Amino acid sequence: MRQAETARKTNETNISLTLEIDGEGKADIQTDVPFMTHMLDLFTKHGHFNLTVDAKGDTDVDDHHTTEDIGIVLGQMFKEALGDKKGIKRYGSSFVPMDETLAQVVVDLSNRPHLEMRAAFPSQKVGTFDTELVHEFLWKFALEARINLHVIVHYGTNTHHMIEAIFKAMARALDEATTIDPRVKGIPSTKGML
């Protein structure tokens, strides 16, 4: 079973997280950042993962540390749960529309972390959430999961819709990339390792 769990406590945040890659879309997300709670909930649903997150942080300062640290811990657990990556498809991509918005996410579970993001959010905030934290979360997730992550919002005018479409597309792309393909024998790389 491809799953991992951890607890991470710093002077800024306290996070417990359990991830099951081959799940049913079951989420139990409790964070001090309501918008991230919403994004993680739909990420779980659309990726068919099972995810439990309990995250508390110094949100009296701002949402940065909590959002960043959730990305770090989720990335670490994603990498751990994938194990040796034998038999996976490795690559995944998804287009997701949300009303006027169209987002595209492409991933390679390559062990070469990179984030390429093309998204111009028209608003700096969604509610109280700073939209610049989306990049921070995605970069930390990609870095710790050691994946190549490309995010493109082709168009859109509503910042909430744009971010939501990104998280849904990322979930669907990761679901595809982590799928076990019976045609893949061993590691999906000519190098013999990822």
Swiss-Prot record:
Domain of life: Bacteria
GO MF term set: imidazoleglycerol-phosphate dehydratase activity
Gene Ontology CC: one annotated term: cytoplasm
This enzyme's EC code(s): 4.2.1.19
Disulfide-linked positions: none
Pathway per the UniProt entry: Amino-acid biosynthesis; L-histidine biosynthesis; L-histidine from 5-phospho-alpha-D-ribose 1-diphosphate: step 6/9
A single BP term in Gene Ontology: L-histidine biosynthetic process
SUPFAM superfamilies cross-referenced by the UniProt entry: Ribosomal protein S5 domain 2-like
Subcellular location: Cytoplasm
Pfam families xrefs: IGPD
Record-linked InterPro entries: IGPD_sf (IPR038494), ImidazoleglycerolP_deHydtase (IPR000807), ImidazoleglycerP_deHydtase_CS (IPR020565), Ribosomal_Su5_D2-typ_SF (IPR020568)
Keyword annotations from UniProtKB, A to Z: Amino-acid biosynthesis, Cytoplasm, Histidine biosynthesis, Lyase
Catalysed reactions listed for this entry: D-erythro-1-(imidazol-4-yl)glycerol 3-phosphate = 3-(imidazol-4-yl)-2-oxopropyl phosphate + H2O
Protein family (similarity comment): Belongs to the imidazoleglycerol-phosphate dehydratase family.
PANTHER family to which the protein is assigned, alphabetical: IMIDAZOLEGLYCEROL-PHOSPHATE DEHYDRATASE, IMIDAZOLEGLYCEROL-PHOSPHATE DEHYDRATASE HIS7
Protein name: Imidazoleglycerol-phosphate dehydratase
Gene: hisB
